[in-house]
Amino acid sequence: MGSTTDTPQPGRGGSIPAYRYNALLAARIEEKWQNHWDENHSFEAPNTAGPLADKAAVAGREKLFILDMFPYPSGAGLHVGHPLGYIATDVFGRFKRMTGKNVLHSIGYDSFGLPAEQHAIVTGIHPRINTESNIANMRRQLRRLGLAHDQRRSISTTDESYYRWTQWIFLQIFNSWYDEKLKKARHIDELQREFDSGKRKLSGTHANTEWKSLSTLEQRKIIDDHRLVYLANAPVNWCPGLGTILANEEVTAEGRSDIGNYPVFKRNMRQWTMRITAYADRLLDDLDRLDWPESIKLMQRNWIGRSTGARVRFASKAGEIEVFTTRPDTLFGTTFMVLSPEHPLVDALTSDSQRAAVEKYRDTARKLNDNERQNDDRKKTGVDTGATATNPVTGDEIPVWIADYVLMGYGTGAIMAVPSGDERDFAFARAYKLPIVAIQMPSDDWFKSHEIKPTADCATWPQAFVGEGTYINSKNKNIAIDGKRTVSEAILLVNTWLEKNNFGTAAITYKLRNWLFSRQRYWGEPFPIVYDEHDMPHSVPDELLPVKLPELMDFKPQTLDPNDETTDPMPPLARVTDWLSVTLDLGDGPKTYRREVNVMPQWAGSCWYELRYLDPTNSERFVDAEVEKYWMGPKSAGHTGGVDLYVGGVEHAVLHLLYSRFWHKVLFDLGHVSSEEPFHKLFNQGYIQAYAFRDSRGQTVPASEVVEENGKFTFEGESVTREYGKMGKSLKNIVTPDEMYDEFGADTFRLYE
């Protein structure tokens, strides 16, 4: 970038005086002071302990920890949407620093993940080279913006010194279990001791077994089943076009990959999973203690989705079919059951005459993703299994069907259908001529509004009645809820009867699913896990961390036919044979172990980065306890502690923000941090919006190359449509800060941003 001199500079319409404020003069002034700030360490915040300590500078000063959601270092660099929040936090931090506060404000880079890997595959350049180059460019852009950051604290999630501690935290979670009585995580060794001493008894399928009668391997499997991180065969989103498994959040509403737009299929695979559901109540209840926007709290509440009701058991020839319902008072109106096509009892339930139809339907359902299956606008389909189950309150034998709108991953994978009180069940019953029994009498006004008589058969009603009316047809010889009573009263009566007669029990369920934590790709944190000859997982010792990511030249995953759901993933690390096998002494002598070949998801590094800013050079701990308490400890009794101000986008409401809270709560339970929550105050800065343009295929085209003439828009001579929305690389409509610096200067850009 050029600089001004004392002689007039040529410009539009003639000469420009040397000290007229323009972009060149702005650059000279701004860079002078940016250099001054660096040379004088103007924005460095002292710690209370460790290499960044300065107790004299800390004494008598109130602390303030300000945090921006750190950027992903893409090849395009920053666009003008990124600084919207950065500038606001910078102004706030500068003001508070001027009032005497000790302000910690820094920024790092969320640099692992699929986008970098996909870019590397396209360009043939190793993702590490790309990532480091992109980070250098972003550092330049941020410095030029004049942000008051403590550069000593900047981190990148791909640094070995950083992901060493990501792996260490993973092992803390892996080596923990959730004690339901104490409502907290505890070390897995404590569970082992409780079983060994007899203090804790076995339950479930081992309820009548003595712990000491089990082999060491059997005991180990039971212990592993309690871990907060565990291996499980579970329905996953398999994307053969990317060669990897995706989290639900990485699949679009159309059932395709968010990156690449490939088809996604539901498959059962063995995957690492984090038991975030153990923390569902705390994640939900502690929202009330946070200074967050109500809209974000509501999104998390809905995502966690706590429901109270009952688990009810229906007897069948294949065994008991358990359902969860929020309305056990409607059991008297249950006239059929619907199971997920993947339900484990389907094979045993299906009659010989219906087997071919059931298998054909299941094959079709396998080709659909969860979003497609639960689309309210899609016609509901199903197949009769030919079996029946017994309604526990009526004693009636009711048909058992399968339907793709019932998901195995939610609830029990089975529902009790009450067509008179549920629109979906009503439509299904109408379509397949299944019985409908009214259990609540609507008001006269309801009948009048639908122009039908109160005496009309409910099967002829135009729709289900979903309101509250007078209970009818709801009694047996032991229980009756007929008449006018509240729903809560009726639920209590039915729940009591179910428990007394061993047909069910009151229960709470959640929409929140456990977190799928494996990725079949290269550019991510390796798992600090090895497997023995029995295929049992073991922790890599702390002193051997980090498990370094091998430098591969061929880092492409085995991408497959995007439409072939029968294929299996082959992670790139599985090809590194000299890395795959390792000899370790884990306490019983040197043995050969096999490394885990999956890597962690991109969310891993961002689950704890706020903690590393506090103590970025500490090689002994992920953060010094005194330093964490100073910057993030609770301010008073009942205060959660955490970052004082966190600024970022609303798009992270149920992903990064929820995952970070989960990790932080585990660290709190284990005594590694003093704060119960990572982010006490949250602010969403909104978006910078811009026009985007799409061609006839619906693909975005570069906005800067679109030509406007007489109100019409073309790209390379072809007509395109214009839409208005968020600025982003994928929409090809970004404007970079560099363009603003060159034309107006950074300070002018900051003012108008």
Give residue ranges: language-model regions.
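Conserved oxyanion/phosphate-binding beta-strand-loop segments in alpha/beta enzyme cores
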Residues: 2-6, 14-67, 97-106, 130-136, ...
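Residue patterns forming the tRNA-binding/recognition surfaces of aminoacyl-tRNA synthetases
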Residues: 2-11, 15-26, 31-32, 36-40, ...
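N-terminal cofactor/phosphate-binding cores enriched in small/glycine residues
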Residues: 33, 42-46, 64-130, 136-143
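Short, solvent-exposed turn/loop segments enriched in Gly/Ser/Thr/Pro and often Arg
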Residues: 50, 69-70, 104-115, 154-162, ...
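Conserved active-site neighborhood of enzyme catalytic/cofactor-binding cores
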Residues: 73-107, 257, 387-389, 410-446, ...
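Catalytic alpha/beta core of large soluble enzyme barrels
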Residues: 89-90, 102, 343-442, 459, ...
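Switch/connector loops and helix/strand junctions flanking conserved nucleotide-binding motifs
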Residues: 113-118, 446-449, 691
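Nucleotide/phosphate-binding sheet-loop regions of phosphoryl- and nucleotidyl-transfer enzymes
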Residues: 264-266, 273-276, 332-360, 471
